[in-house]
Amino acid sequence: IMPDSVSEERRKLINHYGAELILIHDDNNIGECIDECLQTAMRMAEEDPNVFVPQQFINPANPQVHRSHTGQEILEQVDGPIHGFCSGIGTGGTITGIGETLKAANPDMEIWAVEPEHAAILSGGSIGSHLQMGIGDGVIPDILNQNIYQDIYIVKDEEAIRTAQELASKEGIMCGIS
């Protein structure tokens, strides 16, 4: 169950896994659309015992896996001290879990959050639609540790697209725009 504004690549990936894709209309307010997606998922779970809803915006396992695995992997693989970490905010699990792990290793390091320009809710902005899938969902997640980051960067869609293209062409890093 996803907003109909998701990329064609995400749709194909879901279909490739054999899942039924249910699209909810994103009427220029990603927050309301995400709420409707969650309500639809909860209704389906009530009606069908085979439906599992991970509740990633409130599930403490989300940041915990980043504390115990992703954050540890970063510490093990980076040669030398880590001075900064930047992460988009979607469910809040990545920045919370990795941020807490890295801060424990170096309390002086800086952590920056990233929000899309048209869904910068943490920065006090309005909620609209944007192209940076996976972040800026129009909600402040329950699992987000808002004390872990020092600053929030607001990124325009065009800037995110341009940066992803530069990373691909100059560094060979094939990442998405979020």
For the regions a protein language model found, what residue spans apply to each?
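Generic beta-sheet signal
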Residues: I1, I24, Q56, W112-V114
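Short glycine/serine/threonine-rich phosphate/pyrophosphate-binding segments
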Residues: I1, V6-R11, G88-G99, S178
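Active-site-proximal loop->helix
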Residues: I1-M44, L122-I140
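Receiver (REC) domain switch/active-site residues of two-component response regulators
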Residues: E20, H83, Q150
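Short acidic/polar capping segments at secondary-structure boundaries
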Residues: D27-N29, I58-N62, T91, E117
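Active-site/ligand-binding loops adjacent to catalytic centers
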Residues: D35-L38, A45, N50, A104-I177
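Short, well-ordered alpha-helices that flank and scaffold nucleotide-derived cofactor binding pockets
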Residues: E76, E100, A104
